[in-house]
Amino acid sequence: MSQLDALREMTVVVADTGDIEAIKQYQPQDATTNPSLILNASALPQYASLIDDAVAYAKAKSDDKAQQLIDAEDKLAVNIGLEILKIVPGRISTEVDARLSYDTEATIEKARQIMKLYNDAGISNDRILIKIASTWQGIRAAEVLEKEGINCNLTLLFSQAQARACAEAGVYLISPFVGRILDWYKAAEKKEYAPAEDPGVISVTNIYNYYKQYGYQTVVMGASFRNVGEITEIAGCDRLTIAPPLLKELAESNAPLVRKLEYKGEVKARPAPLTEAEFYWQHNQDPMAVEKLAEGIRKFAVDIEKLEAMLAAKL
């Protein structure tokens, strides 16, 4: 049995890509996209018609150039999502514009708009996750959306404070990052880490155990992997979203896979929810998390602007 098949027996495997061919090849349960992946996917020749459709939709909806750009961007992300939903049996994660990461109301509105585009295409809410950065404002937006029946995937999650606040808000799923945490520690400490000592692996392990210990239903989906060792060290996590090159490596390996994450303790009474002040104080105590959250939002915003430049040339 390949490591990928062994992993499927203990963890829901998700593909972290917008590439339809890769998804067909590895048959994941779900798929996740982000602005960077949408940008990469839109350069593939098979997506030209999806871009043309998004542009035509935006032109028909508004005469205002700025509004056309916003509409085309949303429609392109949804068009790619719709193609992926033809292949995966589960859910697609589609991300809210990262530039709205500190605006609760604008995030809620954008999430509703994305969901309406999916609904108009005949897709029900239970096949979509709206991806939102795990800022305090993003978590508050998700809290409102969850009550409306719009499930969220809180991403760019690097600190225990972020994870705790998401669970307390009743968020459907979180994406704690592994590889980007490792990147930070390698740069800061000038050293290499074995998978079992990988700070990203330790972070996800702690979050997983915290959630199970307090009986939170929020799904933990490890994300952002730099190597297969990081994946095998958190085998047993609720879900793992994995890029095609690492899915390939897992599919080609027959090395034994041992379940690493499994909580067997009793469920304890939950602490009082974090206040906004406590959230910021605790998150701020982790310089890695502060830097990586800010950097992640900036990088996604840069890729959204590149995507907009590509679309603007067609509008």
From Swiss-Prot:
Has UniProt tagged this entry with the keyword Oxidoreductase?
Answer: no
Q: What class of enzyme is it?
A: transferase
Chief localisation class: cytoplasm
> Where can this protein be found?
Cytoplasm
Identify which residues the record assigns to the active site.
Answer: 131 (schiff-base intermediate with substrate)
The record's annotation in SUPFAM superfamilies points to: Aldolase
Which keywords are on file for this protein?
Cytoplasm, Pentose shunt, Schiff base, Transferase
Q: Name one GO cellular component term.
A: cytosol
UniProt pathway: Carbohydrate degradation; pentose phosphate pathway; D-glyceraldehyde 3-phosphate and beta-D-fructose 6-phosphate from D-ribose 5-phosphate and D-xylulose 5-phosphate (non-oxidative stage): step 2/3
* GO terms assigned for molecular function: transaldolase activity
Q: From the UniProt record, list the reaction(s) this protein catalyses.
A: D-sedoheptulose 7-phosphate + D-glyceraldehyde 3-phosphate = D-erythrose 4-phosphate + beta-D-fructose 6-phosphate
Could you mention a single GO BP entry for this protein? carbohydrate metabolic process
Please give the Gene3D superfamilies that the UniProt record associates with this protein. Answer: Aldolase class I
Q: What is its EC number?
A: 2.2.1.2
The record's InterPro entries line, in alphabetical order, gives: Aldolase_TIM, TAL/FSA, Transaldolase_1, Transaldolase_AS
Q: What does this protein do?
A: Transaldolase is important for the balance of metabolites in the pentose-phosphate pathway.
Q: How does it assemble?
A: Homodimer.
Database matches in NCBIfam families: PRK12346.1, talAB
* The family this protein is said to belong to: Belongs to the transaldolase family. Type 1 subfamily.
The protein, known as: Transaldolase
Protein species of origin: Actinobacillus pleuropneumoniae serotype 3 (strain JL03)
